[in-house]
Design a protein with these regions (language model features):
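Active-site substrate-binding loop specific to GH73 endo-beta-N-acetylglucosaminidase modules
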Residues: 1-131
Length: 131
């Protein structure tokens, strides 16, 4: 997967990484479901946080020269907890492409194909980004 996207664009690489079953399992996005407050179930925020912190904009705003942007000496964050919660809702409903065993919690299936979307597990409500 990395070999295929090593010299391509960032968007395609991020999509391939996001849909890869090993990444989905490692950062707990695989089998992530839409919220159900009655069952005290909420989307897992782990992958959303890593996308923001490690794979894209980082923790703090930067000047063009890479130095931290400050406000009265304080670092300025690039995103909020609300941003993470909304992005976590985007990353719901993904699982192994072959779920022929029918179990949402099982990790048996095809680990060589990109994960597939499952609409009944996805948060289909409106989402906002960055405030």
């Amino acid at each position: 997967m990395l070999l295929e996207h090593a010299f391509g664009n960032y968007r395609d690489l991020l999509e391939a990484v996001t849909r890869h079953p090993v990444m989905g399992d490692y950062l707990s996005m695989m089998a992530n479901q839409h919220a159900d407050p009655q069952k005290n179930r909420f989307p897992d925020e782990n992958y959303a946080r890593e996308v923001m912190q490690l794979f894209s904009i980082g923790l703090y705003q930067l000047n063009q020269d890479g130095t931290p942007l400050l406000n009265n000496g304080a670092l300025l964050p690039t995103y909020s907890q609300d941003d993470i919660e909304n992005l976590a809702r985007v990353f719901t409903g993904w699982h192994l492409a072959d779920k022929s065993n029918g179990s949402w919690t099982s990790k048996q299936g095809d680990w060589f194909q990109a994960m597939a979307p499952y609409a009944d597990k996805h948060d289909s409500d409106e989402k906002s980004r960055y405030g």
